Amino acid sequence: MTDRIGTLVANSGYGVSAEQRNKVLRNTYWLLSLSLVPTVLGAWFGVATGVGQYFSGVMGFVVFLAGAIGFIYAIEKTKNSAAGVPILLGFTFFMGLMLSRLIERTLGFSNGAELIMTAFGGTAGVFLVMSSLATVIKRDLSGMGKWLFVGVIVLLVGSVINLFVGSTAGMMAISMAAIGIFSAYMLYDIKRIIDGGETNYISATLALYLNIINVFQSLLALLGVFGGERD
């Protein structure tokens, strides 16, 4: 969730033609689908090699934060060049690698695979609902941005505190709040594309990807707490 901060880049694309807006939306959905492949590969590699165990605790958080900020900076710098897509896909592999610790822990449950598929299906459902809402809502949602940003800051601070406290209740509260905030961000970001506020499909993909990955990992964490079964 912390890397979401780096994606809030001002973009004055309003007033573009409907044809261009539709093109950006199509390209965004195409690249978003493609980005899931490196994510799965990264998660698989992390679980298969066991490197995911090194991405826990404070040190794991530091590695995650440094890597995410570095990748996001590189993506924003190259989003208008041929290097933008490969760097974005590299970032999604990195995110899959960082997810591998949670995936590995979930697979430790007897119903772990089922929990992962449930989290995936739930995330897909949230995305479909938000995409549908974005197409029917006529009002300008740009005012949501600053409030959602504040929400992300609060989540970040809460996550850092909980790293040291190690509270399960705190983790659950943060996860539930993250699902709500990043679901709203999906609506906000898709609406921006539809309205012409985002004209670069790489930036748009990055924003939506971060929303999706945060909803997924938060939902999976909650499912592990409430639905994890051990033999």
Spans of features found by a protein language model:
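A hydrophobic alpha-helical transmembrane-helix feature that marks the membrane cores
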Residues: 1-231
